[in-house]
Amino acid sequence: MTVSQAFTLAASDDATLHGLCWLPTGVPRAVVVISHGMSEYGGRYQALAGHLVAAGYAVYAHDHRGHGRYAVIPGWFAAHGGWQQVVDDLRAVVDYARTRHERPVVLFGHSMGSFIARAFMLRHGQRLAGLVLSATGYRQRYLAWLMRGVARLAARLGGADRPNPFMTALVFGSFNLGFLPARTRLDWLSRDPAQVDAYIADPLCGQHPTPQLWIDLFGGIIDMEKGEADGRALPKACPVWLQAGSRDPVSLGKFGLGQLAKRYRAAGLQDVTVTVYPGGRHEMHNETNRAQVEADLLAWLNRISA
């Protein structure tokens, strides 16, 4: 098992960011920075990091605000400007990794982390040598307008900084319907029962986000998709790999990824790759065919970092 090293950074508002890094022997080929999904944490990517390190890559993963062992308020970014803060946090980690290794940085964003990564690319794309988007969504802004309004109402009724099971059920409640009869409420995560059970048993996973996090996330998606539609801020030379399972309820598989790829290409991005894994669910890096996914990721990384 690859041994991780803990690191801390000061955020732009003086909050402390906590993360892990996994380093190869010698100078890395490049650095991969991971932006994790909702209700999980950076340490869940230990296995993926081990495969990347074995191939000569350094890997960094911090815990987004409200996530992980050191969350001040679980499932909460900030009282004000939370979306800007999490994008700025990601910039701090990317800059730290770039400065430490003086090597190209590739950003890997999964699910919620993919939306943060897409916002990062719009604002700071010149810092990236590549972008991997895992289980991302497309044309979410129409739904986001409605859901942000519901989240604002939930904040008024139950508190903006309190975990809100109603919002969790509203957003995720339909995700398991395609897998009935289901063994657990989270069968949509992976076909691998051991991975699903590990997530359920992990005390740092599965917390209910607060209404304020939903307000921040939906507002961020609205602004991010508006910027992508305009296209002028997108870095045209940055290679992008979009990947998801065909049965992922967030990306909607081929449909969602294909539409996003079409938008990126229309904006002038020169290197956009789409991979949809038949039968795969939400976490392809934790799927039954994860060895194939890891091999595909390494092949893509090796190509763009050659």
Question: Model features per residue range: what roles?
Answer:
Residues 1-26:
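N-terminal cap/lid segment of alpha/beta-hydrolase-fold proteins
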Residues 36-40, 111, 246-247:
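Active-site glycine-rich loops that stabilize anionic/oxyanionic intermediates
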Residues 49-74:
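Conserved alpha/beta-hydrolase
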Residues 87-103:
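Conserved acidic catalytic loop of the alpha/beta-hydrolase fold
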Residues 108-113, 117:
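Gly/Ala-rich beta-loop-alpha elbow adjacent to hydrolase catalytic centers
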Residues 117-204:
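Alpha/beta-hydrolase-fold enzymes
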Residues 242-244:
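Short beta-strand/loop motif that positions the catalytic acidic residue
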Residues 265-306:
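Catalytic active-site module of serine/aspartate enzymes centered on a nucleophile-bearing elbow/loop
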